[in-house]
């Protein structure tokens, strides 16, 4: 039995030794065939596919010849596409840009193989210089490709291009070009990479190049906006607030920061902080209707009804189409009446004051109803109470009917 097992193992070993050279021979033929196709400039996609297939085998990953032929196959496709574009012939623009990016990926893959020391402990760079020189000339097409995909709203592809463009600044094979110091488009590429990540709602991609992107002063406000929204997605409250504050301090008029900063403080019941933001905005633009309306809303929530009325009337003087300002004034009068009405021991004078407040509230809430009919939850009950207290039977019956219909 043992002898039989030994014989079987011996037969398998012999078979393996006989088949191995055949496999290597077939691989050599495949490499040679791909090389001939590249040289002839024909069936380049076939040559590319053949070399990519060989590289899927880990045993071939250090084979410089395979990498080199793959690079040349893609390079020829890129150059043929470029020629067609130059001659104004039909060509797939996306494919041309993708070939550009693939050249960088392949060249850096080959360069990483060349960085592995030989038996003598030395690195032999046969391809780094010619490849880096060629790629340096066409590197702007990585940026152009990124912007092209941005316009097509293909943000994943756009990110890959800008990411590759930026990666060149730290890649060993491009060190001599000193992109990090000399490339004036680096921060702009980083901004567009952040933008693409933001549009994908990919927080990792958004933050990856944010440090470099913040050097792009032309887009600084937008950068802070994308970062703030990314921190919010990550539930990083501290950074979200910090970024909103930085943005508002830097440019109070930029439309993103003011409303969200006020909203944050309001949700956290930090109304004094929210009011301080509104006051700072009004110090810069005292007649801004949105700032005035916002301050009026904060004052209403703080219970400072008289100040709310004063500020909200200023907002309407600037813009009389602000529905919310009518609501704020009406509710401020209404709330004062309700507070006074809570006192069961009312004098005749007090009762008159209450009616006066209800009368003052009524036209503003009626106006708000006209401007915002769908906001019944806000205006119906206050008007119901006003009509009830002022003995306005017809108006009361109409509101009562509305409320009963809603209950059904």
Region spans (language model):
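Start-of-domain marker
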Residues: 27-93
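Structural register within alpha-helical repeat arrays
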Residues: 33, 70, 77, 138, ...
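Canonical positions in the second alpha-helix
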Residues: 54, 165, 212-213, 246-247, ...
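Structural marker of alpha-solenoid helical repeat scaffolds
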Residues: 57, 168, 216, 250, ...
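Residue-level recognition of tetratricopeptide repeat
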Residues: 60-63, 172, 186, 219-220, ...
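TPR alpha-solenoid repeat register
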Residues: 66, 174-178, 189, 222-223, ...
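Short coil/linker segments at helix-helix boundaries
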Residues: 73-152, 168-187, 334-364
